[in-house]
Amino acid sequence: AINQALKIEAPKFDKKKFEKAVDYALTLTTQHGDFYPLIRKAFEDAGVIFVILPNLPGSGINGATKKIGQNVMLMVNDRRFYSDTVWFTLFHEIGHIINGDYGITFENEHAGQEDAADKYAEDKLIPPGEYEAFVRMNEFSENAIRRFAERIDRDPGIVLGRLQNDQIVPFTNVALSKALKHKYKVITS
């Protein structure tokens, strides 16, 4: 990832521009085909070099951030590249950048910085007040999840992934996962 990032010319990292690029990225969660080049360009304009790499089996690595000169590298891999995991991993790594901490994120790692990045991703992807109101309704059918996702302008797989992570909907509900989680295939060249 670092080698790829070093090949890319980008302006100096600008946190305010990056925050605007992050808000733009949120608008792309329902665009399954072309989001990567759009986000990559918006981030690059803010000094963040966004790289997607193939998974290294057995590594347990989901993503990483690193300061490289005057830029920041943001890497995610294509492991479990479904709508819920790709967007959560991306926004988790964005959380590290916004919080000013950099490094590698391993699966099932929980510490202060990791928890803060998780919270950032959760709150950016699904507004907390709206999520709490949706959960209180206690209706988690495919249609209910789709309606809520449409209302907050997010991919329904993101909502389902959050419900599963919060142990509200079981991961064993394969039919719901197949119906709502989009599988991405990103061409990175």
Predicted features and spans:
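Active-site hotspot residues in diverse enzymes, especially metal/ion-binding acidic/histidine motifs
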Residues: 1-189
